[in-house]
Amino acid sequence: MSTYAIIKTGGKQVKVEVGQAIYVEKIDAEAGAEVTFNEVVLVGGDKTVVGTPVVEGATVVGTVEKQGKQKKVVTFKYKPKKGSHRKQGHRQPYTKVVINAINA
C-alpha cells in the first residue's frame, strides 16, 4: 500500500500521494519554489497515524508548478419591473502543486 497523507490548506482538507498534482487555494510562492505543508491531519499506509488535531513532526513537501485562475463565474442579480440589474464576474486564483515527499 502506498503512503498517503491528508493535509489542511486553504481551509480545506486534501488527500495527497507522492507524485500527485493538486490544485489548492493561492499560495504566495513563485513557480518552481518548494512549499512545505505542516498541518498534516493523517498519514496512512502500512501504519496509519491520526493526528489530534495534527500529526506531530509530519510534513508534506511539494513544488509549485504554476499559478493560475479558474474559469469565470458570472453572477447576475435583477429586480423585476424596476430596471435594476447587476452583473459581476469572479475568477478564483489557485496554485498547482506537485507533491514530492511525505515525511512522517
From Swiss-Prot:
RNA-binding among keywords: yes
GO biological process: translation
SUPFAM superfamilies for the chain: L21p-like
Record carries keyword RNA-binding: yes
Keywords: Ribonucleoprotein, Ribosomal protein, RNA-binding, rRNA-binding
Protein function: This protein binds to 23S rRNA in the presence of protein L20.
HAMAP family according to UniProt: Ribosomal_bL21
Family indicated by similarity: Belongs to the bacterial ribosomal protein bL21 family.
Protein name stated in the entry: Large ribosomal subunit protein bL21
